Amino acid sequence: MKFYNSTNEIPEEMLKGIDLTYPQLTYLPETGILYDNTYNEKTVPIISGGGSGHEPAHVGYVGSGMLAAAVTGPLFIPPKSKNILKAIRQVNSGKGVFVIIKNFEADLKEFNEAIKEARTEGIDVRYIVSHDDISVNAYNFHKRHRGVAGTILLHKILGAFAKEGGSIDEIEQLALSLSPEIYTLGVALAPVHFPHQKTSFVLAEDEVSFGIGIHGEPGYRVEKFEGSERIAIELVNKLKAEINWQKKANKNYILLVNGLGSTTLMELYSFQYDVMRLLELEGLSVKFCKVGNLMTSCDMSGISLTLCSVKDPKWLDYLNVPTGAFAW
């Protein structure tokens, strides 16, 4: 059982609860739109969103120095384009609006429709598609390139740059430089559980699935669980191969250790310790690390690991700029 009245009502009730908790945030009922009512109209607003079930993403990242607004849809279903359009209109002050979209077919459809309509209204809307997931399809081994936990780095770095006064053109260029440097891979010990619904995959108590998705999608391989260190080795090696860091002159990295819902902080920090030791052996220096439930998959028991090469030292400054977002 879960502490809500029904799966249909929970996103709306959650957003109303957030509105009641944080005076600086305003929820527009029946729209999924939560916006920062202290937003500085002299800066370019950044918005994002997607289906609910990934909390604190994206509503937890609304606030000064991050998102001006987030649009939330039903559980694992993106918001409708009409509500995304309303969010764009809500925060537009004539300087353009920048949108961060996770790379899922349904999300792209709804966001692209909204952006197209906003542009016909004369709003300068730019966007980036987050595609940090390096998992592969188990049937054809094609890269999935889904937008997952690494998306949060776009929220924070772009948001801080916008707060500093970056123009819409400059924000777009920063996004295009930053996004290709972000890589993520996830693993699960147990799938998402919704009352009265079947899980999307099944694992025995002693099994682990590599490459799972944030909507409960199964991974590319299942094997016996052999401890946190074994999982850390798998994820670090896969990220290493993708990033090809032996050929990179820069050895400075940003690290995110993300819980997928029901993974405890004790587990997350234990896993982080394993990862940090491996990265040290590889000669890499972690200049910024964040651990916690950053982008979840409801109550999935799992972890994702994100690495981002510090191509520009200013990215670290932007990560450390204070923000009003309650989940950072």
UniProtKB/Swiss-Prot annotation:
* Alphabetized GO MF terms: glycerone kinase activity
Q: Which residues form the DhaK domain?
A: 6-328
Q: Identify the Pfam families for this entry.
A: Dak1
Its Gene Ontology biological processes?
glycerol catabolic process
InterPro entries linked: DhaK_1b, DhaK_dom, Dihydroxyacetone_Kinase
Q: Write down any Gene Ontology CC term.
A: cytosol
Q: Which UniProt keywords apply?
A: Transcription, Transcription regulation
List the cysteine pairs that form cystine.
none
Q: Which residues carry this modification: Tele-(1,2,3-trihydroxypropan-2-yl)histidine?
A: H215
Q: How does it assemble?
A: Homodimer. Interacts with a homodimer of DhaS.
Q: What does this protein do?
A: Coactivator for the transcription factor DhaS. The heterotetramer formed by DhaQ and DhaS functions as a transcriptional regulator. Activated by covalent binding of dihydroxyacetone to DhaQ. The complex activates the dhaKLM operon.
Instruction: From the Swiss-Prot or TrEMBL record, give the protein name.
Output: DhaKLM operon coactivator DhaQ
The organism's taxonomy opens as:
Bacteria, Bacillati, Bacillota, Bacilli, Lactobacillales
